[in-house]
């Protein structure tokens, strides 16, 4: 019998990232875990619908036995079984992030006995989670370089707080892992601005694009009007394509916040990324830790290691026989497998 790993949910960023990472790693390694003080660092501690959906999805895919899987629970025991490929559908029942649920279960399906398709309904444009276009246009091309083949499709948008969106991913078992080397960003090839609107006047998007264009030379400016019943909602994105990597940044519009202020938040974030020679942005860095650890080698550079990144590394090192090294050099932090 494999030993039970004990995790403190209050460590590091103190949110749902510890739980999601532990679920992924438990499914992959077969190691059971107990986590206490779940989301202790949040205003509403314990499992929310999105986290509970991730737990139930993980349990279904690997036939796990679970204790504490209920709303508000701050303690969970997860004993995994064998991961099974197949077709799965999960509903969050709120505007909780579809992509964070997918992020939890897809790594285990890289080791399944056959191809899989996972469909999740809930929120797709959430201010605290990566949108589907980030997964599709930024993360998945990098995963393909590592040898991981999955394809995400956004079937319907669902903005916060209404939800109602649908995202699906098709994924195949991994034959072998390759090493990812992302030390240099390279020169910028082009930048693309994009605005999504649902039930929001078009002039909002035009003002947001104008704000982006006032700070950057945009090769493309796209405004997409979605059906009104998918809103109300508004998301502004800016994609930076460089020689070695494509990064994508986004901001979700809010009621009573002007278009100019929303877009200015995005401008600030992109300028912060471009001010450093690091290849990888803060949010992408979190998501490269697990696939890099599974490959057993690789490196990337990031401007500053976030609390999420350090938390992810700490959890990975509890489940896998790997050690990460973080070295500050030339104004960046180089993250690698030691």
From Swiss-Prot:
HAMAP family listed in its UniProt record: RTC
Residues annotated for ATP binding in this entry: 103, 283-287
Primary site of residence: cytoplasm
Annotated protein name in UniProt: RNA 3'-terminal phosphate cyclase
Pfam families recorded: RTC, RTC_insert
Residues forming the catalytic site: 308 (tele-amp-histidine intermediate)
PROSITE patterns in alphabetical order: RTC
Gene designation per UniProt: rtcA
Entry keyword ATP-binding: yes
Catalyses which reaction(s): a 3'-end 3'-phospho-ribonucleotide-RNA + ATP = a 3'-end 2',3'-cyclophospho-ribonucleotide-RNA + AMP + diphosphate
Functional description taken from the UniProt entry: Catalyzes the conversion of 3'-phosphate to a 2',3'-cyclic phosphodiester at the end of RNA. The mechanism of action of the enzyme occurs in 3 steps: (A) adenylation of the enzyme by ATP; (B) transfer of adenylate to an RNA-N3'P to produce RNA-N3'PP5'A; (C) and attack of the adjacent 2'-hydroxyl on the 3'-phosphorus in the diester linkage to produce the cyclic end product. The biological role of this enzyme is unknown but it is likely to function in some aspects of cellular RNA processing.
One of the GO biological process terms: RNA processing
EC number(s) recorded for this UniProt protein: 6.5.1.4
Gene Ontology molecular function: ATP binding; RNA-3'-phosphate cyclase activity
Annotated localization: Cytoplasm
CC terms in the record's Gene Ontology section: cytoplasm
Family, similarity comment: Belongs to the RNA 3'-terminal cyclase family. Type 1 subfamily.
Keywords: ATP-binding, Cytoplasm, Ligase, Nucleotide-binding
């Amino acid at each position: 019998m494999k030993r039970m790993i004990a995790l403190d949910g209050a460590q590091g960023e103190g949110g749902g990232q510890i739980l999601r990472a532990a679920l992924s790693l438990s499914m992959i390694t077969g190691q059971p875990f107990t986590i206490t003080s779940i989301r202790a660092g949040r205003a509403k501690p314990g499992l929310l619908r999105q986290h509970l959906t991730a737990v139930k999805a993980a349990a279904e895919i690997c036939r796990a036995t679970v204790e504490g899987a209920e709303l508000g629970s701050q303690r969970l025991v997860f004993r995994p079984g064998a991961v099974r490929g197949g077709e799965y559908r999960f509903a969050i029942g709120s505007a909780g992030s579809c992509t964070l649920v997918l992020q939890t279960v897809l790594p285990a399906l890289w080791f399944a006995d056959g191809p899989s398709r996972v469909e999740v309904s809930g929120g797709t444009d959430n201010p605290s989670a990566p949108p589907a276009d980030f997964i599709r246009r930024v993360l998945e091309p990098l995963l393909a370089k590592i040898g991981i083949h999955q394809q995400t499709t956004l079937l319907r948008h669902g903005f916060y707080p209404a939800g109602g969106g649908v995202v699906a991913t098709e994924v195949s078992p991994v034959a072998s892992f390759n090493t990812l080397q992302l030390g240099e960003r390279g020169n910028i090839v082009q930048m693309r601005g994009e605005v999504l609107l649902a039930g929001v006047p078009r002039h909002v998007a035009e003002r947001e694009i104008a704000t982006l264009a006032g700070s950057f030379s945009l090769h493309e400016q796209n405004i997409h009007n979605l059906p009104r019943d998918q809103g109300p909602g508004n998301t502004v994105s800016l994609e930076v394509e460089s020689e070695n990597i494509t990064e994508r940044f986004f901001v979700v519009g809010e009621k009573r916040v002007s278009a100019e202020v929303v877009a200015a938040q995005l401008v600030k974030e992109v300028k912060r990324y471009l001010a450093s020679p690091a290849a990888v942005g803060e949010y992408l860095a979190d998501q490269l830790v697990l696939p890099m650890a599974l490959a057993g080698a690789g490196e990337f550079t990031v401007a500053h290691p976030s609390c999420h990144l350090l938390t992810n590394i700490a959890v990975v090192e509890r489940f896998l026989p790997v050690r990460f090294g973080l070295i500050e050099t030339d104004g960046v932090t180089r993250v690698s497998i030691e």
